[in-house]
A protein has these predicted regions:
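Alpha-helical transmembrane segments in inner-membrane proteins
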Residues: 1-345
Length: 345
C-alpha cells in the first residue's frame, strides 16, 4: 500500500471523525438543554433553535422558549467552551512540560484565578461577569508571576515549573480559604464553596460570548505553534535544535493557557481532570501531531463537559452536584491508570 493511499485514508478517517464529533456535540448540547427540573422534549429544543434562526415558524410553549433561551442553552454552550478550553490547555501543557500528568492547573493559575474571583465576590469589589473575570485575571496573573519568579522566567526547567506550580496552588488556596473564613457570611461561604467545585448555574449569554472569544483565540495561538509543540514532545534540546526559540515560545504558550484557564475559572470555578483525561485519549486515537490533537481535544473536551454538567443535574435530582465532583469521578481512576503505566515503564 503506497504512502499516498495511507495518507488519503488517514485524511478520510480524520474528516469523518471530526464530522461525527460535531454532530455528537450538537446532540449532547440539545440533551443538556432538554434535561432539568422542567423537562423539555428534544423536538421542542430543535424547533426553538430553528425558529430563532428563521428556518421554521413552529408555535411553541412560551415557558419552554424562555427556559431554553434565558437559561439552558447559554449554560450548555458555556460548558462546551469550558471543556474545549481545558482540554486544549491540557494538551499544550503535557507537551510543554513533557509530563503525562500535566493539566491546566499545574501552574497554580487556577488557584490564583479562584482567589481573585472569590475576593471580588466576598469583598464586594464589583458586580457582574466583568468584575468577576477581572478579579480572576488579576489572580491568575499574580500566580503566573509567582511561578515565573520561582522558575527564573521562561528559562526554568520542567521539574522546577511543576514544583513552582504546586507551591503557587498551595499559597493561593490558603489565601482563598482565609478570605472566605474571615470575610464571608455563612450563606455566602456555602455559595462560594459550591462554585469553587465547579458550577455553570449562573452563566448567561455575556459569559458565553467572552469564553467563546478567549477559547477560539487561544486555540488559534496554539495551532500556530503546533509544530513547536510537536518538537517539545521530544524535549527542549530537540526543539532548540530545530530552530525554535524555546524560552519565548514556552512563555507565549504559558500565557495563553493561563488566560484560558482564568476565563474558565471566573465563570465556572475549578473543574479538574478534563485537561488530564481528554488529551491522553485523543492522543491514543489520533496520534501525537498537535494540529490534529488540539482540535480533537477541543471537541472531545466540549462533549465531556456538557455530559458532566448533565450528570451533575441528574444524579441527585432535584438537587445538583458540583460539576467538579463528576469530572473527578471520571478523572481519578484514569489518573491512577496513568501512574500505574508510568511505574511499569
Amino acid at each position: 500500500m503506497t504512502a499516498a493511499v495511507l495518507q488519503a485514508r488517514q485524511g478520510l478517517f480524520l474528516t469523518t471523525s471530526a464530522l461525527l464529533a460535531i454532530v455528537l456535540l450538537f446532540l449532547v448540547i440539545a440533551l443538556g438543554v432538554s434535561v432539568g427540573e422542567l423537562s423539555i422534549p428534544l423536538d421542542n429544543v430543535f424547533y426553538a433553535i430553528s425558529n430563532k434562526m428563521g428556518l421554521t415558524e413552529v408555535p411553541l410553549n412560551r415557558i419552554y422558549e424562555s427556559v431554553i433561551w434565558d437559561f439552558r442553552l447559554s449554560r450548555a454552550l458555556v460548558a462546551a467552551c469550558c471543556g474545549a478550553g481545558l482540554a486544549i490547555c491540557g494538551a499544550v501543557l503535557q507537551s510543554l512540560l513533557n509530563n503525562a500528568l500535566a493539566e491546566p492547573y499545574v501552574l497554580g493559575v487556577s488557584a490564583g484565578a479562584s482567589t481573585g474571583a472569590v475576593s471580588v465576590v466576598v469583598l464586594g469589589v464589583g458586580t457582574g461577569a466583568v468584575s468577576l473575570s477581572a478579579g480572576a485575571f488579576a489572580g491568575a496573573f499574580a500566580a503566573f508571576a509567582f511561578v515565573a519568579f520561582l522558575t527564573n522566567g521562561a528559562r526554568g526547567g520542567n521539574e522546577r515549573t511543576i514544583l513552582a506550580g504546586v507551591a503557587a496552588s498551595q499559597l493561593f488556596n490558603a489565601i482563598t480559604a482565609y478570605t472566605i473564613s474571615t470575610s464571608a457570611s455563612a450563606q455566602q461561604a456555602r455559595d462560594v464553596m459550591f462554585w469553587l467545585l465547579g458550577s455553570f448555574s449562573g452563566v448567561r449569554w455575556p459569559e458565553f460570548q467572552l469564553v467563546l472569544v478567549v477559547v477560539l483565540l487561544g486555540l488559534a495561538v496554539c495551532l500556530y505553534y503546533s509544530r513547536a509543540l510537536d518538537a517539545f514532545t521530544f524535549g527542549d534540546d530537540a526543539a532548540a535544535s530545530l530552530g525554535i526559540a524555546v524560552p519565548w515560545v514556552r512563555l507565549a504558550l504559558f500565557i495563553t493557557t493561563a488566560l484560558i484557564t482564568a476565563t474558565i475559572v471566573s465563570m465556572a470555578g475549578s473543574i479538574g481532570f478534563v485537561g488530564l483525561v481528554v488529551p491522553h485519549v485523543m492522543r491514543f486515537l489520533f496520534g501525537p501531531l498537535h494540529r490534529t490533537l488540539l482540535i480533537a481535544s477541543a471537541l472531545a473536551g466540549a462533549i465531556l463537559m456538557v455530559l458532566a454538567d448533565i450528570a451533575s443535574r441528574m444524579l441527585i435530582a432535584p438537587q445538583s452536584l458540583p460539576v467538579g465532583v463528576v469530572t473527578a469521578l471520571v478523572g481519578v481512576p484514569f489518573f491512577a491508570v496513568i501512574i500505574y503505566r508510568s511505574r511499569n515503564k
